Amino acid sequence: TGATYKDDKGRVEIDYDKCIGCRMCMAACPYSARTFNWNEPVRATGASYGDARVPERGRGVMEKCTLCKERTDEGDEPMCVRCCPADARIFGDLDDPDSAVSRLRREQSAEVLLEEKGTRPQVFYVR
């Protein structure tokens, strides 16, 4: 359908206006990282959660982690990084050799998932 695309930063994204919910991308995803949204979005009245910058995804479309692109595009960290109680997640610019994430990648043994499938992963796991 053309709903899945790679943005200028290399992130795999979904255009919700083009997604028809056929789930072909879910079947093709080598990471099994996509889910189908079966329900209408529900927001509890008066509840404070989520990020207003994130578009609401309606029922019948695919979803996946975007590393909080709305936040990272504005220089903020993804919420999982910001909220991790163990500070076990680091987000940064791999093209900047002085960034914390680049230093960690150089100094530690970093692994990626499914690189052999040509996925060009941008998430690194460091021990």
Where are these regions (language model features)?
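Non-ligating segments of multi-cofactor redox enzymes
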Residues: 1-127
